[in-house]
Amino acid sequence: MQWEVVIGLETHTQLSTASKIFSGTSTAFGAEPNTQASPVDLALPGVLPVLNRGAVERAIQFGLSIGATIAPRSIFARKNYFYPDLPKGYQISQYEIPVVQGGQITIQVEGKQGVYEKTVNLTRAHLEEDAGKSLHEDFAGMTGIDLNRAGTPLLEIVTEPDMRSSAEAVAYAKALHSLVVWLGICDGNMQEGSFRCDANVSVRPVGQEKFGTRREIKNLNSFRFLQQAIDYEVQWQIAEIEDGREIVQATVLFDPDTGETRAMRTKEDAHDYRYFPDPDLMPLEIDAAWVERVKSELPELPATMQARFVSQYGLSAYDASTITATKALAAYYEAVVTNVGAASAKPAANWVMGEIASQLNREGISIDEAPVRPAQLAKLLARITDGTVSNNTAKKDVFPAMWAGESDGDADAIIAAKGLKQMSDTGELEKIIDDVLAANAKSVEEFRAGKEKAFNALVGQAMKATKGKANPAQVNELLKKKLG
């Protein structure tokens, strides 16, 4: 039997406000346990929550960026459950009327047949407070509770069950991560828990309309774990069904050490949480003027910039998507193009995605820390275009020296110091090619007999004779001319 995978994601995005969603306490990461927990966060008697306007504004920014509807009136609700790190005994969230409704995110997915585009529909995004943190490893035989995180503002972003593979889920998560960081509403630090995903996974026979029973994999804080967890869960569910067992709706955890998921508890439904409107908070009202002001202050969005890079610079959709993965990378690329000219936009993209990206990954640094700045890379590209150096020499000899800071990263100075300038004297090059042809009569004979490989051998000999300083295109042209 053929099976179809059905995936929906719920992503908890920690909003980048200086203070918590219902109190004035700092949200800074890394403080000593319980030093950033106010009476509101501790749920002491007599305290009342006050909504953080900045959290609402960030939710509006996100909603506008995905083409969602911003609810003119939304309601906060109490989600009731008991857990040691939830001091109130309930979480303030949104249930029936969330602040952001609908919306779409378009993703680029690498499939077996190449890259394809897919649109993922969003159900909603709602504001809520984070819980505290249980510390299981700090005390022998006991669990500690750190309430510094309690009350930190979250935007929970929920998709429709639109994804059909772990690759699509990861592509969506990466696109969402890129968007919230681009907007500046979240720092995106997955190690610190600023961006974490829950994956709802089920399987059904191909062609069946009814969804299978889903299991929710909680708190996945890396794209690799997201993919591994979904892949394992899918295979587990298929094996269970094919062995005649029934899937039970449950919440599961992923163990990175074993690569397996394991059930944590039977999955609750909404009625188990006994949602009801929070009597301590007035309904949130957002007027059109507020929405319009936020809209006017939005930066150019990744999707808009991607489309512009395709139309203005002739990039492929995939290359444009790669370059706009972060705002800083896109700004770097566009600065290179501004300096070198739009005619070199495609080579500039190749260099940014190739040599620049490779060095950044190798050294574990960001584009802002790259020692080769846009104007310097633009000068190197100009020297390739005007024939001063070949692309190969630029990659092998000039760029590494620029990255190392030689000659203050100036391409012209490095080319001169290392004697890398291509031969510009056509007469001298013709003489060298004549000598190569005379010394390689057998290759000449083989080429004239129809063996194309012999021509490549002659090109190689000519480049060797010029110590790599000849322009390969010019060598090809002269050889073809002389060989008839």
From Swiss-Prot:
Q: Sorted alphabetically, which Pfam families does this protein's record hold? A: GatB_N, GatB_Yqey
Fetch the InterPro entries from UniProt: Asn/Gln-tRNA_amidoTrfase_suB/E, Asn/Gln-tRNA_Trfase_suB/E_cat, Asn/Gln_amidotransferase, Asn/Gln_tRNA_amidoTrase-B-like, GatB, GatB_C_1, GatB_Yqey_C_2, Gln-tRNA_amidoTrfase_suB_CS
> What's an example of a GO molecular-function annotation for this chain?
asparaginyl-tRNA synthase (glutamine-hydrolyzing) activity
Q: Which SUPFAM superfamilies match?
A: GatB/YqeY motif, Glutamine synthetase/guanido kinase
Superkingdom per UniProt: Bacteria
Calcium found in the keyword field: no
Q: Which UniProt keywords apply?
A: ATP-binding, Ligase, Nucleotide-binding, Protein biosynthesis
Q: What class of enzyme is it?
A: ligase
Biological processes annotated in GO? glutaminyl-tRNAGln biosynthesis via transamidation; translation
Tagged with keyword ATP-binding? yes
State which Enzyme Commission number(s) the record gives: 6.3.5.-
The reaction(s) catalysed by this protein are:
L-glutamyl-tRNA(Gln) + L-glutamine + ATP + H2O = L-glutaminyl-tRNA(Gln) + L-glutamate + ADP + phosphate + H(+); L-aspartyl-tRNA(Asn) + L-glutamine + ATP + H2O = L-asparaginyl-tRNA(Asn) + L-glutamate + ADP + phosphate + 2 H(+)
Q: What does the record give as the function of this protein?
A: Allows the formation of correctly charged Asn-tRNA(Asn) or Gln-tRNA(Gln) through the transamidation of misacylated Asp-tRNA(Asn) or Glu-tRNA(Gln) in organisms which lack either or both of asparaginyl-tRNA or glutaminyl-tRNA synthetases. The reaction takes place in the presence of glutamine and ATP through an activated phospho-Asp-tRNA(Asn) or phospho-Glu-tRNA(Gln).
Q: Assembly state and interactors?
A: Heterotrimer of A, B and C subunits.
UniProt record similarity statement: Belongs to the GatB/GatE family. GatB subfamily.
By its UniProt entry, which HAMAP family does this protein fall under? GatB
Protein name in the entry: Aspartyl/glutamyl-tRNA(Asn/Gln) amidotransferase subunit B
Gene it is expressed from: gatB
